[in-house]
A protein has these predicted regions:
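Catalytic phosphate/metal-binding cores of nucleic-acid and nucleotide-processing enzymes, i.e., regions
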Residues: 1-114
Length: 114
């Protein structure tokens, strides 16, 4: 897949937010925007799932997106605190992540940045 045909991260985020809002049933979902007052490394999308569990979704471009060390650290902290954290590149991966979170799954691996 040529790099120019891979969707931008912004496109991935917008597709996921659209699906989350259309699907409904989630207590809360929002896109965390970077600003001078925002903390670096926070997940792109935060959701409260149907069980009331905190879910952090870090969106990346398919095949080429990589976590930073700080993003990996924060995703690990979310998982260690009882939340659910996932790196996603598509709506299909979000569907799987939300189902796993709602089933009570823990993150099965540590996130490694870089």
């Amino acid at each position: 897949m040529a790099a120019e045909s891979i969707p931008l991260e912004k496109t991935v985020v917008n597709q996921i937010l659209k699906w989350l809002k259309e699907t409904g049933g989630y207590a809360y979902c929002y896109k965390s925007h970077g600003s001078a007052y925002a903390r670096s490394g926070l997940p792109d999308i935060v959701v409260i799932d149907k069980r009331g569990r905190f879910v952090g979704l870090e969106c990346k471009r398919p095949k080429v997106g990589r976590l930073t060390i700080l993003q990996a650290k924060i995703l690990n902290q979310i998982a260690e605190s009882g939340g659910y954290a996932a790196v996603v590149t598509s709506v299909e991966e979000v569907i799987q992540a939300m189902a796993a979170s709602e089933a009570g799954a823990a993150v099965g691996r540590r996130f490694i940045g870089g």
